[in-house]
Design a protein with these regions (language model features):
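A charge-rich, low-complexity, intrinsically flexible signal that marks solvent-exposed coils, linkers
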Residues: 1-107
Length: 107
């Protein structure tokens, strides 16, 4: 019975690490996506772009999945009159995800 308990603890620890890693990658992805969107919106790099990126990260807490992040950026880009397609948004989100995985793996 003791071996099973230790094994369960090992699985729980691995699950926890995986969830933390997933959270870090997603948050980093959203930040990178937000910085890209800030550039599309013409926001200057630095504090303004960082502040906008934080709003994109926060948008991901509204609902599970990527739809809330895409919708937030899509709405802001449309309001600004910037021509970016849904396909371009999704491609950029995927690029940001790949970069986020790379960055988190290196940290």
């Amino acid at each position: 019975m003791k071996g099973l308990t230790e094994r369960e603890k090992g699985f729980e620890a691995e699950f926890k690490r995986n969830q933390e890693l997933r959270f870090r990658v997603t948050a980093r992805r959203n930040r990178l996506f937000g910085l890209w969107a800030a550039a599309q919106l013409g926001l200057p790099a630095g504090e303004e772009a960082d502040a906008y990126a934080k709003t994109v990260v926060a948008a991901d807490f509204e609902a599970p999945g990527d739809a809330d992040v895409i919708e937030k950026v899509r709405t802001d880009i449309d309001k600004a009159g910037v021509a970016v397609t849904e396909r371009e948004l999704r491609a950029e989100l995927e690029r940001a995800a790949a970069e986020a995985r790379r960055q988190v793996a290196q940290s």
